[in-house]
Regions:
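Adenine nucleotide-associated cytosolic modules
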Residues: 1-261, 273
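Serine residues within intrinsically disordered or low-complexity segments
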Residues: 264-267, 271
């Protein structure tokens, strides 16, 4: 894929990076990322993906912008309060980088919409505000073999990991029981969610381009109040209901059935012509 003169100039500083180059930039341009949540985490992730030149970004978030969102949601403006936040996010990203494509989905993640969203993506970023949506994204990414960058924070604490289906523990392995999570029950400082979001965006760029060493199979925990960072390897549960061995067998059978049904439908269409 050739770059336009504008693209070459726009991305010239990162193309200079050892191990990145034009090949890394091409991989970003050819990639589609889905970001669930467009808040202090997801919005900032999307900002740096857009700046880096990820070819298509799908933003998924229902609901309107609230005044108390503005301490951390840097894609928004005060004048947008009361309106669907995902559309303002799209506008801001395209103003930053009109060379990319941005799709705005003003919906919350549900069992009905998540598969269609994930199937379009080369990578997913889990920045949703509750674990119901996070678990749905995790399950879909495992089903369809899509890498997922998992990022979450509460107060001054945060964690980050990369989940590669079939290789690493999934979110259900890390949290076999859903954590108690009240979206209004903890304070949030914009600089904390922003710091985590920058690391999450970088993690995704690493996975897409091969730059550096991503956190595959490692969980990075952060206490940003004391600048304390630690890494550990979470347990990969062979009996996990989402990614365990038996689940993989069921998934393989499911995909084969889906492919067979697709071929049958195509055959039926041809026979009607």
């Amino acid at each position: 894929m050739n770059f336009t003169p504008t693209e070459r100039e726009r991305y010239s500083r990162q193309i200079q990076l050892p191990g990145f180059g034009e090949e890394g930039q091409k991989r970003l341009k050819d990639s589609t990322a889905v970001v669930t949540g467009v808040g202090g985490l997801g919005g900032t992730v999307a900002l740096y993906l857009a700046a880096a030149g990820v070819g298509k970004i799908i933003l998924v978030r229902g609901g309107d912008l609230r005044l108390d969102d503005l301490n951390r949601q840097i894609l928004m403006t005060n004048s947008w309060v009361g309106q669907p936040r995902v559309y303002k996010a799209k506008e801001t990203l395209l103003n930053l980088n009109p060379e990319i494509e941005v799709e705005a989905v003003s919906e919350f993640v549900t069992a009905e919409n998540i598969d269609a969203l994930v199937q379009q993506a080369d990578i997913a970023f889990d920045c949703a505000f509750d674990f119901k949506e996070r678990n749905l994204l995790n399950q879909a990414c495992v089903r369809w073999g899509v890498p997922m960058v998992e990022a979450a924070m509460s107060g001054m604490d945060a964690y980050l990991t990369s989940i590669i289906p079939g290789e690493t523990p999934c979110l259900s392995c890390i949290f076999p029981e859903t954590p108690q999570w009240d979206r209004w029950g903890f304070g949030v400082l914009g600089a904390v969610s922003g710091s985590l979001a920058c690391l999450a965006a970088l993690e995704g760029i690493k996975l897409l381009t091969g730059l550096g060493e991503p956190l595959t199979g490692q969980l990075l925990t952060m206490d940003l109040g004391t600048a304390t960072f630690a890494k550990r390897r979470p347990y990969h549960d062979p009996n996990c209901p989402v990614c365990g061995d038996f689940t993989k067998q069921r998934l393989s059978s499911y995909i084969r059935r889906q492919e067979a049904e697709g071929r049958s439908q195509e055959s039926g269409v041809r026979s009607q012509k």
